Amino acid sequence: MRATVPTNILPLDHLVLRGADDAPALVLREAVISFKDLRTRVSRLAGWLMAQVPEPGARVASWVAKGELACVMPLAAARAGLVHVPVNPLLKRAQVAHILADSGASLLLATPARLGSLEPGDVPGGCTLLAESDALFQAEALASECVPSSADPDALAAILYTSGSTGLPKGVMLSHANMWLGAESVASYLGLEADDRVLAVLPLSFDYGQNQVLSAWYAGASVVPLDYLTPRDVVKSIERHAITTLAAVPPLWVQLAELEWPDSASKSLRRLTNSGGALTTDLVHRLRALFPGARLFAMYGLTEAFRSTFLDPALIDSNPTSMGKAIPHAEILVVHDSGELAGDDEEGELVHCGPLVAQGYWQDAERTAERFRPAPAGSAYGGIAVWSGDRVRRDSQGQLYFVGRRDAMIKSAGNRISPQEIEEAALATGLVAEAVAFGMPDKR
């Protein structure tokens, strides 16, 4: 039976229309922004962006702290008919220079300190630089509002940069449909409700982090963005805001599990989500003991297809190392090297099919052809699939388990790291004659 793609897909900026007018949408240090106010801010920032960058489809980058602009920019750029390029705040100037040049960004909004770190030659010609606070002030002063977008769901909405096994970061192209359906899918299987409060501690520059915001707004829930210095800051924010939903990666979960939690903080949590690396059996047990009233979602995903699987929280105690099954709007196949579908408990490559599959790598036809290939003959969706390079197996109950990777990518703190990029950086110092980078196991 052929699977069908949903037809009720809207442009990404329509997410701000889903919450009640007076419901809190964004909780900042200095203010609580309702959905009604959020709609105005998205509209005005979009109007300002159109005045600054009138060319439809132009790329606009943000390299900012986790505040109003970081949260609003994905929707405002989409409404303005532009393509948002969020830059990880942890990246250094050379990496940012590559992203600006590769994406052909027409505008970079950043903190003054980050703008000051750029050197001559880092910014391509035709790219305007502006401090994020100035952008917000000018958008408010201009007060040029932009109506909700009528963009084609297949139109490009964002480019997210992720490390590759062969050097510099590559840009993953995401459409309005990719991001809308990703938000709908996660809100659905997590069971998010309008009274939920999501603490956004992960970087908004990659899919797992950005979806914290988008899936919450799909459900009409509120988001509390947090740039934390220590794990204790996370606990304090959860207690202060009565947070119900926390998404993290294994290294942060390890740190959080080592802390003493006030009852008021741990009891408000309804759900915990993990991606970016596998949870150990010991860590699962510790989290379940620390948060007995919260459902723990173990998940697997890749930027090229957003999210692939999640494990039913009811099975986490008996299957702590499982990746679970496909999320809504995804089809996950296990494929032999021969191209045939693998049987139960047979190892193969994880292949993700369906409407969450990205549009390829920005201006990189060669690497796109390597990773984005026709779906196997047994696919219910057909079309183009993501061949992940990850080796997995599926048991007789349909649960998936991670086995390993084909390439040399290193996974650290939830980030995919290119060993070649590290080696080239070491050689560029002139202090070493040869360099090799590889990952070391860490039981934590």
Segments from the language model and where they lie:
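Gly/Ser/Thr-rich phosphate-binding loop
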Residues: 243-248, 257-319, 331, 338
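ANL superfamily adenylate-forming
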Residues: 113-154, 259
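Conserved AMP-binding/adenylation subdomain of ANL enzymes
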Residues: 180-197, 204-245
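AMP-binding/adenylate-forming catalytic core of the ANL superfamily
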Residues: 91, 246, 354, 359-360, ...
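Conserved ATP/PPi-binding loop(s) of AMP-dependent carboxylate-activating enzymes
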Residues: 325-329, 340-376, 415-417
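Conserved AMP-binding/adenylate-forming
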Residues: 31, 46-94, 201-203, 416
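Conserved pre-ATP/AMP-binding loop-to-beta segment of ANL
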Residues: 143-161, 168, 191-197
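Conserved AMP-binding A3 loop
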Residues: 34-36, 157-181
